Amino acid sequence: MTFIHWRYSPAQIQALLPGWLTAEEFDGSAWVGLTPFLMEDVRVPGTPALPWLSRFPETNVRTYVRDALGRRGLWFLSLDAGRLLPALGGRAGYGLPYHWSDMSVRVEGERRAYRCRRRLIGPAGARCDADVELGAPLLDTERDELTDFLTERYRLFTVVGGRSAHAEVEHRPWPLRRARLVRLDQDLLRAGGLPSPEGDPLLHASSGVRVRVGMWNLS
């Protein structure tokens, strides 16, 4: 998994949120993450993984928010999945803005090449090509507050049936590495309602963790 983050003004992010959420700031900025990764062993609890359904690339555009109770979490501006059924399931089951896309992840040594071309359920032609080179592991003593702000989130917010909802996200802390962006050509942020980002992005990479997303609850 690769985390690619940019600063945005809080007002720009707040304009894209429902009224019951507030853009969370760090160092005076709201933050948006572009996160391409490979989903593996995806399954409903108590059921077996299916080779043709349980492994697929995904790329998310997300931001960081608080609700009226002060609970921190994620708000997704878009989620692209390389399989149609998970995209439909994410929309129907969680109210998340999933899109079905033509996607791939290529691994060559310390290089990761992510490709995404949106097919259906959304603006045609939206894309993301990202080439990333992994660096040294990030030691626990090198993790700062911003790193945890951007990567350690244990709740997602959504709207189900017109009502505010949330789901708990369980995982151990991400084992992180430094990363360098070799190439990026994307318009997923624009398709999600954002202007083009300014400045160099902040990158982290991870070998991944096992994640469990609970059922949604009305907030």
Question: For each predicted feature, which ranges?
Answer:
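Glycine/small-residue-rich interface belts in oligomeric ring/scaffold proteins
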Residues: P10-T59
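Terminal catalytic/cofactor-binding subdomain
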Residues: F3-H5, F26-D27, V211
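Short secondary-structure boundary micro-motifs
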Residues: R7-Y8, G46-A49, L88-G89, L194-S196
